[in-house]
């Protein structure tokens, strides 16, 4: 949607590769591209949608120094889709302190109904173990209780839909 809306400049940061467990919730994840760079897959898709898009692709896992460097560019909006707690907490804290507009994705694993998605303040999330952990650590480590816009689903996780991996 963002690329289709005419955004002129975008940076995507992701050091991860497609894994079979991503297929129930991540657009780039297909049965045919396991092991491929998520950032490169999304870059190809974004450029196919909007060939005029000025796109910076960083194929690395995010770290505090990288976040601080990217925030210096003062982006108009930040979308966080990090799925690991520690880097997510650090990213949210730095973005929050910068005063920039940010929206953060919460857990989608074991949730199947996209019509249940909501955008709310993080303090209003429930039935989301991932959001619960994010809230807990933001509060404990940084005193942040609210003021973070998030996308989450109040749908109860469906345990039967989980795929166990090693």
List PLM regions with ranges:
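Adenine nucleotide-associated cytosolic modules
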Residues: 1-166
């Amino acid at each position: 949607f963002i690329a289709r809306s005419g955004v002129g400049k975008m940076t995507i940061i992701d050091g991860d590769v497609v894994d079979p467990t991503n297929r129930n919730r991540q657009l780039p994840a297909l049965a045919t591209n396991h092991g491929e760079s998520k950032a490169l897959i999304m870059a190809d898709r974004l450029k196919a949608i909007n060939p005029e898009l000025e796109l910076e692709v960083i194929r690395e896992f995010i770290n505090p120094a990288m976040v601080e460097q990217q925030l210096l560019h003062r982006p108009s909006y930040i979308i966080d889709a990090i799925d690991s707690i520690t880097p997510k907490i650090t990213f949210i804290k730095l973005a929050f302190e910068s005063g920039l507009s940010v929206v953060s994705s919460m857990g989608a694993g074991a949730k199947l109904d996209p019509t249940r998605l909501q955008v709310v303040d993080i303090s209003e999330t429930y039935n989301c173990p991932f959001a619960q952990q994010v809230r807990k650590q933001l509060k404990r480590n940084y005193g942040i209780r609210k003021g973070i816009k998030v996308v989450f689903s109040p749908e109860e996780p469906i345990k039967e839909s989980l795929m166990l991996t090693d």
